[in-house]
Design a protein with these regions (language model features):
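Mature N-terminal, pre-catalytic/accessory segment of carbohydrate-active enzymes
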Residues: 1-39
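Surface-exposed amphipathic alpha-helices with a cationic face
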Residues: 36, 196-204, 329, 353-354
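Conserved, well-ordered alpha-helix/loop/beta-strand core segments that scaffold catalytic motifs
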Residues: 185, 189-218
Length: 512
């Protein structure tokens, strides 16, 4: 890890934009500039994959593909394949600070289809190169999505057996029958990748590093499970034998039933973990640092019988441990990873995090919350090790303001005593709480944007085990104020976390 630094957690979807959802538009570039002026070194985002039912970025149709929602329509207007009038004619939803996913789904894809049909993409050398270089995942993904659209979006396990089980004649038939639909899917991935890499390059030139995020598991309804069932615990009909989740704890009496297929770790070991190596090699093209969700699943994973209604009957199974990361290191060298080691943590999980050398995560909200079944002392800021990343909360937690309102009076009293602060109004407590972890020993400190803004739980990103109200929050442009920027700059400077790197272009100009 580099020297002391700070960053902000801000999903791409939450950026301001003209057309219903944050994307790789001008606003994203302006946010990079804003981060730089605030003295930040890192921009942490959520997974970028195409989302399915529930809109969760942790349940994606592909491990490798990007979400077409994030393609900048403004950029396509500049290319001449869309018009501004066409984009403005779409109903993107009434609430500026929230995402209406139904309207996004109904509005974006027809526009992207128009852009594809006007693009003459088959004559584009860069497109052809992209398709060639990424054929190892793109070919299956594009076919998967084209067939899914043909079957009105139903899960692949409900498809006819010939294409569900990838029989040769059926594969050939659909590749020919859906040729233009497949090319459309490839076009969207090309534009996603092109625009994202341009944005990342801009951020890096400004001295901003991107912290990406990958789920440990893939979704059952994904191109990954359809194309490579051998990687997962599926039976001969490609039905899961067991699925992932979490055991009951202080937050949930029945645990969490995620429903993702589990890995067939024996097969991965036999193949030298090649799929994982390919996956991580690819994501390190997209991001500078990678946060791996549910890191404890590499030590032990919770296995729940397929068809169970809760996680109560699940049990722990042994994961690959350091064997996987040794192989990854042999293939890719040292890579900057953040291990999400929250929740139920055992000594063996701690050993794995330590042996990997990856920094773990420390979340302030857990320090004073008696509902947490782990050791709260681990989350008190004076105990944070240098090799860790400190957060007030994550996308799965309440906002600081929401958390303060949900904890007991005794916990509020304990928090104020720890802060040595009995006078700050509740509406402004986010500031001393943020300062608390900014001055900790943790080398990196990442604050969700909602906490800098002091927003309540109406702006919470996700409530685990719920569907329908999550992943919707968007920042308004006027909230990215110069005043807030200066406040963040001040606290970052005060605790030795400033980004002193020069803008690459400005430095080059100065030398002329």
């Amino acid at each position: 890890m580099s020297e002391r630094a700070a960053g902000i957690l801000m999903p791409i979807s939450s950026l301001p934009s003209e057309y219903g959802i944050g994307c790789f538009s001008k606003s994203a570039y302006e946010f990079v500039d804003w981060l730089k002026k605030a003295g930040q070194s890192y921009w942490q985002i959520l997974p970028l994959g195409p989302t399915s039912y529930g809109d969760s970025p942790y349940q994606s149709f592909s491990t490798f593909a990007g979400n077409p929602y994030f393609i900048s329509l403004e950029a396509l207007v500049e290319e001449g394949v869309l018009t501004k009038a066409e984009c403005e004619a779409v109903d993107w939803g009434k609430v500026k600070g929230s995402i209406d996913y139904k309207k996004i789904y109904e509005g974006r894809y027809p526009l992207l289809r128009k852009a594809y049909e006007r693009s003459n993409v088959h004559e584009n050398a860069a497109y052809q190169q992209f398709v060639k270089e990424n054929s190892w995942w793109l070919s299956d993904y594009a076919l998967f999505m084209a067939v899914k659209d043909r079957f009105d979006g139903v899960e692949w396990k409900l498809w006819a057996d010939d294409i569900k089980l990838r029989w040769g004649p059926a594969m050939d038939y659909y590749r020919e029958e859906l040729y233009f639909d497949i090319e459309f899917q490839q076009y969207m991935q090309f534009k996603f990748y092109e625009q994202w890499m341009q944005l990342k390059a801009y951020a890096n030139k400004k001295g901003i590093q991107i912290i990406g995020d990958i789920p440990i598991y893939v979704a059952m309804d994904s191109a990954d499970t359809w194309a490579h069932p051998e990687l997962f615990q599926l039976d001969e009909e490609n039905v899961p034998v067991a699925v992932a989740g979490c055991p009951p704890d202080g937050f949930s009496a029945t645990g969490q039933l995620w429903g993702n297929p589990l890995y067939r770790w024996g097969y991965h070991k036999e193949t030298g973990y090649q799929w994982w190596i390919s996956r991580l090699a690819y994501v390190f093209r997209l991001y500078d640092v990678v946060r791996i969700d549910h890191f404890r699943g590499f030590d032990e994973y919770f296995s729940i019988p397929y068809g169970a209604e809760t996680a109560v009957d699940g049990h722990w199974e042994k994961g690959p441990g350091m064997d996987l990361f040794w192989k990854v290191r042999e293939a890719l060298g040292e890579k900057p990873v953040i291990a999400e080691d929250l929740g139920y943590v055992t000594d063996s999980v701690r050993d794995l995090v330590r042996d990997s050398g990856f920094p773990g995560m420390k979340v302030l909200e857990f320090a004073f919350d008696s509902r947490d079944s782990g050791s709260a002392n681990d989350y008190l800021p004076h105990n944070y090790p240098v090799n860790s990343v400190a957060y007030t909360g994550t996308h799965d937690n309440e906002t600081l303001a929401g958390w303060w309102g949900s904890i007991s009076k005794d916990e509020q009293k304990l928090t104020r005593e720890y802060l040595c602060d009995t006078y700050t109004p509740e509406a402004e407590l986010n500031k001393p709480l943020i300062s608390l972890i900014m001055r900790s020993a943790a080398k990196w400190c990442v604050i969700p944007m909602q906490d800098y803004l002091g927003l309540d739980n109406k702006c919470r990103m996700n409530t685990p085990s719920t569907v329908g109200t999550n992943w919707k929050w968007r920042i308004r442009k006027n909230q990215l104020s110069v005043k807030l920027q200066k406040e963040i700059h001040a606290v970052t400077l005060r605790y030795g976390r400033m980004n002193w790197t020069e803008d690459v272009e400005e430095a080059a100009e100065a030398e002329k």
